[in-house]
């Protein structure tokens, strides 16, 4: 029993060493799992983040710098951001009409739209005031150049981008702003064009008028001129927004995307069947197929459209099979739309009684092209979605491989551990485990122990007497 008590402290360090080894092994398990999880999440997040980045290639003048797309507003996350309509041969029109008691009068306007066409003459968008007022704003293509013409009570004011070629069938973005009689126009990434009409200052008009006004009528005329000067900077009682230009004699043929005007996303509203919008003529929402038409007739119609001057920048399965000369299948036609940026609108600040407006923000979409060729809006979105999924899968596989390598290394290191720490002193009498668990064996050993002790006592007695 004494041998057992003396030998019992020895296994203690071995057990403690085993516990620390187990802790180290657990630590080696936790660290790679944590790192692998972070690696997988980071890889997947970077791939998903790349989905929202638009890369632009091409000439130094067209789309050389990416423009940020603001996705934060809830209105852009409603599922219709970048709604695209195709205006086919023969023309069509989308008309939005303000309710009679809700027609705005604005000192500043913002217009943004994406389009593609090959026409040299066309009217894209026109905003008109109520009958009898004569105020209007028109976005048009004249001799292959994009321009805007408007009138808010004086003469027609025109602004045009003469350097950019926009009737090349490629996707372009135009942004227009108006503040009183002043205006700016930008196409894609070309420099902003500014227009400041002469005599737009109230003080200049007053100085000219005072020279011919009798002194006794000066105060009354001054007040009238001031009021008239303010009125000549306001777009009064806006009534309708007409998209497509069918009524103007130059119907637009091509694609229009994500129209934004002073907070209104008219194409989005048209896709949602807004009660204030009327669609007429050959106008089709991208991805929409009339229920009365079969897949074969739809493919034939698309093929005939592509043979005309209308450059439809949308790709569908039926169109692609028709181009290859194969028989169209019964597979559904997929919808591919591009994101559209929306320029923010500012509410006019005026002392007059103007209907309140609510500013909104957003962004306008830029085209994506590769190698100088024409890439249809929306096709790159599918590629980015698949690449994001691939990146996430690769990240998970890499993390799993890292875990396996670390596990194999740990198993190799701790499989043949040195057992030198378990020293057994042969000179000491250790009782085996079977002796600890079997009481009968211990009792059998007791007589022998008693005899050995008596023998030692006798030897001591002998030594004492000697």
Swiss-Prot record:
Tissues in which the protein is found: Brain and arteries (at protein level).
TM regions (residue ranges): 391-411
Cytoplasmic-side segments: 412-466
Keywords for this protein: Angiogenesis, Cell adhesion, Membrane, Signal, Transmembrane, Transmembrane helix
Residue ranges of domain Laminin G-like in the record: 85-283
Membrane topology (UniProt): Single-pass type I membrane protein
InterPro entries: ConA-like_dom_sf, Laminin_G, Neurexin-like, Neurexin-related_CASP, Syndecan/Neurexin_dom
Disulphide connectivity of cysteines: none
Gene Ontology annotations of biological process type: angiogenesis; cell adhesion
Record's GO cellular component terms: membrane
Extracellular topology ranges: 45-390
Database matches in CDD domains: LamG
Compartment(s) where it occurs, according to its Swiss-Prot or TrEMBL record: Membrane
Keyword Transport: no
Family to which the UniProt record says this protein belongs: Belongs to the neurexin family.
Identification of the protein by name: Neurexin-1-beta
Species classification: Eukaryota, Metazoa, Chordata, Craniata, Vertebrata
């Amino acid at each position: 029993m004494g041998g057992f008590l003396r030998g019992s402290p020895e296994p203690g360090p071995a057990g403690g060493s085993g516990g620390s080894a187990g802790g180290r092994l657990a630590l080696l398990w936790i660290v790679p799992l944590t790192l692998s999880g972070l690696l997988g999440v980071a890889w997947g997040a970077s791939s998903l983040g790349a989905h929202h980045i638009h890369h632009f290639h091409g000439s130094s003048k067209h789309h050389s710098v990416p423009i940020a797309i603001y996705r934060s507003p809830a209105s852009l996350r409603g599922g219709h951001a970048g709604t695209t309509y195709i205006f086919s041969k023969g023309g069509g029109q989308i008309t939005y009409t303000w309710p009679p008691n809700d027609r705005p009068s604005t000192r500043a306007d913002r217009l943004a739209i994406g389009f593609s066409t090959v026409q040299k003459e066309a009217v894209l968008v026109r905003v008109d005031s109520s009958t009898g007022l004569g105020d209007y704003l028109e976005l048009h293509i004249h001799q292959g150049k994009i321009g805007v013409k408007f009138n808010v009570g004086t003469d027609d004011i025109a602004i045009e981008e003469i350097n950019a070629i926009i009737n090349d069938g490629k996707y372009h973005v135009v942004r227009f702003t108006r503040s009183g009689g002043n205006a700016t126009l930008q196409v894609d990434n070309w420099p902003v064009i500014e227009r400041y009409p002469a005599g737009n200052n109230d003080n200049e008009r007053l100085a000219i008028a005072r020279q011919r006004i009798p002194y006794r009528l000066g105060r009354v005329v001054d007040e009238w001129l001031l009021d008239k000067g303010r009125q000549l900077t306001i777009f009064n009682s806006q009534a309708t927004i007409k998209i497509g230009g069918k009524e103007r004699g130059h119907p637009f043929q091509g694609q229009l995307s994500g129209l934004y005007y002073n907070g209104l996303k008219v194409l989005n509203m048209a896709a949602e069947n807004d009660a204030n919008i009327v669609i007429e003529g050959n106008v089709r929402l991208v991805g929409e197929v009339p229920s009365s038409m079969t897949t074969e007739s739809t493919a034939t119609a698309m093929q005939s459209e592509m043979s005309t001057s209308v450059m439809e920048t949308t790709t569908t399965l039926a169109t692609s099979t028709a181009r290859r000369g194969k028989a169209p299948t019964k597979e559904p036609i997929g919808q591919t739309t591009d994101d559209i940026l929306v320029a923010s609108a500012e509410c006019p600040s005026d002392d007059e009684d103007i209907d309140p407006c609510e500013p909104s923000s957003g962004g306008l979409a830029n085209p994506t092209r590769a190698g100088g060729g024409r890439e249809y809006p929306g096709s790159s979105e599918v590629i980015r979605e698949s690449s994001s999924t691939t990146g996430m899968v690769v990240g998970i596989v890499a993390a799993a491989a890292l875990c396996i390598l670390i596990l194999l290394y740990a198993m190799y290191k701790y499989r043949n551990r040195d057992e030198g720490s378990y020293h057994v002193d042969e000179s000491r009498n250790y009782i085996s485990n079977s002796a600890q668990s079997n009481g009968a064996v211990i009792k059998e050993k007791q007589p022998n122990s008693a005899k050995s002790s008596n023998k030692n006592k006798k030897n001591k007695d002998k030594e004492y007497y000697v």
